[in-house]
Every structure is written in structure tokens, then in C-alpha cells.
């Protein structure tokens, strides 16, 4: 699949900095707000293929974090989807990847799961 896309002039970039012009397609796992800002700053065309469920989780995490809640995200911390949700929540978030990690958290009243 990647080869056939490459034959059409479509490639994978690890950073928006690799692009000077053209169109960026965001995959279904989504990305954090800094990527959207970089795309806009460079004047690149955007095709956002973020899954609607992921987008909803991102926006919910952002809203709750902006309201002062601490957001707990359950999942693998290095999974792209989890990383993107955490980036939207910012510093007011925590990723839990196992039951053991969950058992070691001291919950306070403004944490949202």
C-alpha cells in the first residue's frame, strides 16, 4: 500500500517541518494541537481523517482540562491515539496503562476518568 501511494507522489512525514507545500492528511489516530498550528502556520492544505470518536475524545479532554479537571486517559501511553488525546488535555492529564498503575494513583476530587 505504501509503495502504491509513493508511486502517486504521496509519502509519510514525521514532522510538518518536512513539508514546504502541498497537502497533509492526518491519520485516523489524530494529532495534538501543535500539529494543527504548524500546518496552519506553513499554509499547508489539510485533510483531517481523524476518527470522529477520537476527535470527540480529544475535544472532551481539552474541555475538561480547560475547566480545571485532571483528565485520566486509559490506554497504552505510546499509542498514537492516546498520545493525541493527552496532547489535547495538556499538563492536566495522566495516562494509565495498567491496573497496577491505576491502583497507585492518589485520586483527588477534580480528576475525571
Give the positions of each predicted feature.
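The feature marks the mature, well-folded catalytic cores of soluble enzymes
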Residues: 1-113
Amino acid at each position: 500500500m505504501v509503495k502504491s501511494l509513493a508511486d502517486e507522489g504521496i509519502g509519510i512525514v514525521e514532522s510538518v517541518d518536512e513539508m514546504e507545500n502541498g497537502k497533509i492528511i492526518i491519520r485516523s489516530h489524530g494529532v495534538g494541537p501543535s500539529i494543527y498550528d504548524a500546518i496552519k502556520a506553513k499554509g499547508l492544505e489539510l485533510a483531517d481523517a481523524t476518527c470522529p470518536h477520537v476527535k470527540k475524545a480529544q475535544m472532551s479532554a481539552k474541555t475538561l482540562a480547560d475547566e480545571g479537571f485532571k483528565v485520566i486517559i486509559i490506554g497504552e501511553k505510546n499509542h498514537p491515539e492516546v498520545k493525541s488525546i493527552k496532547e489535547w488535555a495538556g499538563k492536566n492529564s495522566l495516562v494509565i496503562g495498567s491496573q497496577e498503575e491505576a491502583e497507585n494513583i492518589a485520586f483527588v476530587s477534580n480528576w475525571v476518568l
